[in-house]
Amino acid sequence: MNLPTAQEVQGLMARYIELVDVGDIEAIVQMYADDATVEDPFGQPPIHGREQIAAFYRQGLGGGKVRACLTGPVRASHNGCGAMPFRVEMVWNGQPCALDVIDVMRFDEHGRIQTMQAYWSEVNLSVREPQ
């Protein structure tokens, strides 16, 4: 099988953001290959396999309402890889916050996420006014 096309990568990554926005943890986890790795944020020890990835998303998304939206177009290559800028809005330590992130993903020949690296740190976190 071939790797996803650039257009398919764009669609897959946009779908990922949609699923994060609605908090569909099971559907997010199903987007990953069985042996996938997640580095979130990049530089932390990788999380390996769907079971650990599911626990990571349950911890991160299961505690409250999280919103996510793209803040620019998905950039995709012809080798099954892509990058996207997006914003996550959440409540952190009782304070409404926004986190600006860039995710880099590599997909396998089945269109599943093989690797995901999230680029962010505390310098990308901003306090929002309560709504």
From Swiss-Prot:
Catalytic reactions of this protein: a 3-oxo-Delta(5)-steroid = a 3-oxo-Delta(4)-steroid
Induction statement: By steroids.
Record has Lipid metabolism as a keyword: yes
UniProt-annotated binding residues for substrate: 103
Effect noted on mutating residue 127 to A: Slightly reduces activity and reduces protein stability
Keywords recorded for this protein, A-Z: Isomerase, Lipid metabolism, Steroid metabolism
Record annotation: effect of changing residue 16 to F: Reduces activity 2000-fold. Reduces activity 10000-fold
Pfam annotation, one family: SnoaL_2
Effect of residue 57 to S: Reduces activity 100-fold
Residues annotated as the enzyme's active site: 16, 40
Domain of life: Bacteria
Documented effect of changing residue 103 to N: Reduces activity 4-fold. Reduces activity 10000-fold
One annotated GO molecular function: steroid Delta-isomerase activity
EC number: 5.3.3.1
One GO term (biological process): steroid metabolic process
UniProt key word Isomerase: yes
CDD domains: ketosteroid_isomerase
Assembly description: Homodimer.
Protein's name in the database: Steroid Delta-isomerase
